[in-house]
């Protein structure tokens, strides 16, 4: 039983590292995606106010999946083996493999934080709906914390699903927070 708990925690930690790598993409791209959307909406309003046709969006696709991650200094496309959480950063000594520009230590920090939180959640609650719910909440909060630090924004794309997921988890008794307390917290926080 004890070995199983540690195995769940170790697997959770590794999965957390992988999620942390994806969260780095979310933290970097989601605010930029929001800014692009705001600019497009503003251009449409301005065109409408001037009686013109709204401008066509000619910018290349930019979302959480496209384009592939690149070095901001030289444009080198990050290969799969350069994107292994924490290990690639250590192997590359914190530098781009192409131009040797320094990579922020924040990337492995996000990965390690997410891995540690998933490890804790899986150790505390095991591979149960409760453990998985807390892993999801932890991942969302890591993304929100870093986005807030960078931009002072808390994107609705994360906060609103988090609110509903919290209420659902409470209703299904996956947390020890009573549903009434969750609803009151959601009402007060929103």
Region locations from a protein language model:
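Transmembrane helix-loop-helix
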Residues: 123-130
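Functional transmembrane core segments of multi-pass inner-membrane proteins
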Residues: 12, 130-190
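Membrane-proximal soluble regions of multi-pass membrane proteins
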Residues: 28-106
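Intrinsically disordered, low-complexity, positively charged segments
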Residues: 19-22, 26, 41
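C-terminal ends of transmembrane helices
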Residues: 24-29, 93-98, 141-153
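Conserved Radical SAM active-site core
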Residues: 115
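Hydrophobic alpha-helical transmembrane segments
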Residues: 1-22, 118-123, 166-174
């Amino acid at each position: 039983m004890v070995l199983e708990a540690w195995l769940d925690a170790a697997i959770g930690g590794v999965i957390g590292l992988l999620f942390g790598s994806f969260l780095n993409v979310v933290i970097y791209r989601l605010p930029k995606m929001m800014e692009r959307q705001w600019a497009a909406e503003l251009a449409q309003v301005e065109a409408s106010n001037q009686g013109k046709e709204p401008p066509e969006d000619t910018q290349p696709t930019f979302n959480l999946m496209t384009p592939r991650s690149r070095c901001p200094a030289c444009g080198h496309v990050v290969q799969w083996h350069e994107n292994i959480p924490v290990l690639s950063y250590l192997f590359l000594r914190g530098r781009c493999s192409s131009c040797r520009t320094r990579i922020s230590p924040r990337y492995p920090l996000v990965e390690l934080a997410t891995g540690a939180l998933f490890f804790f959640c899986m150790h505390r609650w095991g591979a149960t709906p409760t453990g998985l719910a807390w892993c999801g909440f932890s991942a969302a909060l890591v993304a929100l914390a870093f986005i807030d630090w960078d931009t002072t924004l808390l994107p609705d794309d994360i906060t609103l699903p988090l609110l509903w997921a919290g209420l659902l988890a409470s209703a299904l008794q996956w947390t020890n927070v009573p549903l009434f307390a969750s609803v009151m917290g959601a009402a007060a926080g929103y």
